[in-house]
Amino acid sequence: MDGIKILATFSVLVLFYKLFTYSKKGGVSQKEAVKALLKTEFREFELVEKEQLTHNTAKYKFKLADESHVLGLPIGQHITVKTIIGGKPVSRSYTPTSLDEECVGFFELLVKSYPEGNISKHIGDMKIGEKINISGPRGFYEYVPNVHKHLAMVAGGTGITPMFQIMKAIARDPSDKTRVTLLYGNVLEEDILLKQELDDLVKQRPDQFKITYLLDKPERDDWEGGVGYVTLDLMKESFPSAEEDVQLLVCGPPGMVSSVKRNAVALGFPRAKPVSKMEDRVFVF
């Protein structure tokens, strides 16, 4: 365990050094762009496009106030969406699938709408030209290139969004050598979100990215992915040893998250904290 503690301390020092130097350089090239987000107030953004992906999931494109603006969201963080339902304010957090570097003048959200879901149903019922209220950025994770040699990711359902955002950022940066192994679980094959985009990322970085898709109920006899849940054995088989320079990122349904956290401890990772911080070896979005 001493080796793990030394590695953890070293990783924290490297993280803060790289975060400092990364921010000194202005991060990416849009440091001159006007950022649309504000933490202290909600701003309205107009829905300009909707693409239905599954029977209950769609990608929504929202226009910023000016076509030269960027959303201003650090990679790995999220926004808060708020509306009034039944006379009461309700809110929920979402991670956009778009990056500031590639989406100037707009941003995109991936939302699965539930009949009983206040915000998700509200967004699902939106018509082109209607507006939502958003504030941010929020969250304790901000991706910085090359802090860890390996990112071990576990995602379920729409929990893929922060993972996809991070992988896109890595793929866009030729100097980023971070390796990614993703276990992505869903109920049915049709529930797999952003599959084409994820497969394209693997094609761009075949030596860095590896994805295993898992289904609870595969409907094809020739399904080539995994079946069932993210088990201890699967994590042990797929991910590097906890003694290596690896950070575990988790996002998905509560039951999946709880199971993965228990498995992580059994594999030698530190116990996940109630509120994850950027430097933690196990980070839960």
From Swiss-Prot:
Gene3D superfamilies: Nucleotide-binding domain of ferredoxin-NADP reductase (FNR) module, Translation factors
UniProt superkingdom: Eukaryota
Catalyzed reaction equations: 2 Fe(III)-[cytochrome b5] + NADH = 2 Fe(II)-[cytochrome b5] + NAD(+) + H(+); 2 Fe(3+)-[Dph3] + NADH = 2 Fe(2+)-[Dph3] + NAD(+) + H(+)
Involved pathway(s): Protein modification; peptidyl-diphthamide biosynthesis
Keywords in alphabetical order: FAD, Flavoprotein, Membrane, Mitochondrion, Mitochondrion outer membrane, NAD, Oxidoreductase, Transferase, Transmembrane, Transmembrane helix
Binding site for FAD: 124-139, 150-182
Cofactor(s) needed by this chain: FAD
Entries under Pfam families matching the protein: FAD_binding_6, NAD_binding_1
Record-listed E.C. numbers: 1.6.2.2
Cellular compartments annotated: Mitochondrion outer membrane
InterPro entries given in the database record: CBR-like, Cbr1-like_FAD-bd_dom, FAD-bd_FR_type, Flavoprot_Pyr_Nucl_cyt_Rdtase, FNR_nucleotide-bd, OxRdtase_FAD/NAD-bd, Riboflavin_synthase-like_b-brl
Transmembrane spans: 7-23
Record GO terms (molecular function): 2-(3-amino-3-carboxypropyl)histidine synthase activity; cytochrome-b5 reductase activity, acting on NAD(P)H; NADH dehydrogenase activity
Topology with respect to the bilayer: Single-pass membrane protein
GO cellular component, one term: mitochondrial outer membrane
S-S pairs: none
Annotated GO biological process: protein histidyl modification to diphthamide; tRNA wobble base 5-methoxycarbonylmethyl-2-thiouridinylation
Domain FAD-binding FR-type span(s) in chain numbering: 40-144
Role description: NADH-dependent reductase for DPH3 and cytochrome b5. Required for the first step of diphthamide biosynthesis, a post-translational modification of histidine which occurs in elongation factor 2. DPH1 and DPH2 transfer a 3-amino-3-carboxypropyl (ACP) group from S-adenosyl-L-methionine (SAM) to a histidine residue, the reaction is assisted by a reduction system comprising DPH3 and a NADH-dependent reductase, predominantly CBR1. By reducing DPH3, also involved in the formation of the tRNA wobble base modification mcm5s 2U (5-methoxycarbonylmethyl-2-thiouridine), mediated by the elongator complex.
Complex and partners: Monomer. Component of the 2-(3-amino-3-carboxypropyl)histidine synthase complex composed of DPH1, DPH2, DPH3 and a NADH-dependent reductase, predominantly CBR1.
Family affiliation: Belongs to the flavoprotein pyridine nucleotide cytochrome reductase family.
PANTHER family in the record: NADH-CYTOCHROME B5 REDUCTASE (PTHR19370), NADH-CYTOCHROME B5 REDUCTASE-LIKE (PTHR19370:SF184)
Protein name, UniProt field: NADH-cytochrome b5 reductase 1
Organism this protein belongs to: Candida glabrata (strain ATCC 2001 / BCRC 20586 / JCM 3761 / NBRC 0622 / NRRL Y-65 / CBS 138)
